[in-house]
């Protein structure tokens, strides 16, 4: 593990950029970027176009270590290059931004009020490749729809079981049990979730380190004891469907919680913009998300 990267993620000022739209969400991301579905005829072309979008974001002069601590990449991006370097190497060597990899394969159907992760059949191989490509950590998402104690326990157990496998491979897992922001009992779900996470953290070996990616809590500063836990490198927040303005406003009220936004980061960016327009738009977004993250 790279100690410089660990120090940067643990104590640095800034946020984590989520650039990990997967195959399922890529058409929507491209559409928002101004590229219609008839612009590509197969998955390869689609991933090629989305890599160009990500490359444009990463290479932007606004995308700097001053504001951004890390970036979460989709598996396909890990194997692609920017200026003849693999994307993770470009991020760290050229930008001093720590690379993470999304490892989950999507969600199961809702059961017991939650959506667990689908089995990650190639996890060992994927982690091996991630280490070879100088990835620092991983991210995997599951979703809580209802305050169902049984479901939430199962979901957190699954996250930590896989998390331990990731730690053994020499990487830092971002554990992401998202609470659906539209859930009618969101606050109750958050209470159950925090209890389960605290229980799992208490069972970890002293040297085991994890990160958490959580929905912005209903009650401000509700996750402060997770932020202060010695096993937790950092707690980051997802925007979860809030608009950029609302996500930033809510985040700013939670001390020690930093952003890991994707939609809120790329909002307003289009393929048709000139470099000046593109860089101006993303610069404004980055600075505003950063300001909310350091409160």
UniProtKB/Swiss-Prot annotation:
It catalyses: beta-D-fructose 1,6-bisphosphate = D-glyceraldehyde 3-phosphate + dihydroxyacetone phosphate. Pathway: Carbohydrate degradation; glycolysis; D-glyceraldehyde 3-phosphate and glycerone phosphate from D-glucose: step 4/4. It is an enzyme of class 4 (lyase). Coiled coil: none annotated. Its EC number is 4.1.2.13. Keywords: Glycolysis, Lyase, Schiff base. GO terms for molecular function: fructose-bisphosphate aldolase activity. Gene3D superfamilies: Aldolase class I. GO terms for biological process: glycolytic process. Belongs to the class I fructose-bisphosphate aldolase family. This is Fructose-bisphosphate aldolase class 1. It comes from Clostridium beijerinckii (strain ATCC 51743 / NCIMB 8052) (Clostridium acetobutylicum). The lineage of its organism: Bacteria, Bacillati, Bacillota, Clostridia, Eubacteriales.
